[in-house]
């Protein structure tokens, strides 16, 4: 039942139970059973512990990012208050869910961690993933992403001097492309290729030098100042632009892996039309989806059956 509920809207899961097994189950029962086991999986999540003393694997690739998921709040009944239609008290909004992944170079089975909580909690989930992926006292961590401050700060907080971070090359190139429209016009394709080669050779100072003469005046609003935006983005991330070193080491310079993971871990189930979640239930479903993505589904149910025996 929870297998279907993990992948399909609860009404659809009930229909599949009827279709495949000839069992008629109320939608509320599917929801309750699925969320019950999601809560158990959430409670079983490993917590951050002291870093292991052994050397660990040489290198781990780490990525972390957030995406918005739909949440709903409904006013709770007040003792002594006249009965009312609580549906009229619904307030819908969006809440950021942070997803982390870690794996050795060449691996296609990352360890995932996720939270609806603070950036510090997200960092702890990242650290747990690293530990599960074989991290140790000598492991080097190669982080890649959009350069958000909360991510770079957590990389440093969790891994210290063992970590290096790289701004997603393709994300930076989006800024560069917008600037190229202004600077190069019809010659933009050739201009872009040249600047990409410079960046991959760590010649970001030369890129800034090319942008500088075209910087828009300060009184030009941000949406109309793509050169200034690109110049600022590069200037703010100069410590995270070692593309030459990453390429030489055979390490990724793009973070498409975490972007794809948001779709198949979170969004395919938790961001569907008409689906709004209470925060406490969303936490359970996230834990359930992460456990499945980590390949822990069979082990979980084996333990459940052993305890029931």
Q: What spans do the regions from the language model cover?
A:
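Catalytic center-proximal scaffold of phosphoryl-transfer enzymes
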Residues: 1-309
């Amino acid at each position: 039942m929870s297998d279907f509920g993990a992948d399909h809207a609860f009404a659809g899961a009930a229909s599949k139970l009827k279709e495949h097994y000839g069992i008629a189950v109320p939608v509320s029962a599917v929801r309750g059973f699925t969320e019950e086991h999601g809560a158990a999986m959430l409670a079983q999540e490993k917590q951050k512990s002291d870093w292991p003393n052994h050397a660990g694997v040489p290198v781990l690739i780490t990525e972390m990012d957030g995406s918005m998921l739909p949440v709903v709040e409904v006013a709770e009944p007040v003792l002594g208050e006249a009965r009312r239609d609580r549906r009229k008290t619904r307030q819908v909004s969006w809440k950021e869910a942070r997803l982390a992944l870690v794996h050795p170079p060449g691996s296609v089975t990352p360890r995932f961690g996720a939270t609806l909580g603070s950036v510090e909690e997200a960092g702890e989930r990242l650290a747990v993933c690293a530990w599960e992926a074989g991290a140790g006292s000598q492991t080097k961590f190669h982080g890649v992403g959009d350069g958000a401050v909360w991510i770079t700060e957590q990389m440093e907080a969790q891994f210290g001097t063992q970590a290096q971070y790289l701004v997603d090359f393709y994300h930076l190139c989006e800024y560069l492309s917008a600037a190229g429209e202004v600077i190069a016009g019809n010659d933009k394709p050739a201009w872009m290729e040249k600047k990409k080669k410079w960046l991959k050779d760590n010649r970001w100072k030369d890129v800034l030098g090319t942008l500088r003469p075209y910087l828009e005046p300060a009184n030009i609003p941000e949406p109309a100042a793509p050169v200034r935006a690109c110049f600022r983005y590069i200037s703010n991330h100069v410590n995270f632009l070692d593309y030459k070193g990453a390429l030489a080491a055979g390490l990724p310079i793009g973070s498409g892996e975490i972007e794809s993971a948001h779709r198949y871990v979170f969004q395919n189930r938790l961001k569907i039309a008409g689906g709004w979640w209470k925060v406490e239930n969303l936490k359970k479903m996230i834990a359930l989806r992460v456990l499945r993505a980590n390949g822990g589904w069979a082990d979980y149910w084996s333990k459940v059956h052993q305890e029931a025996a």
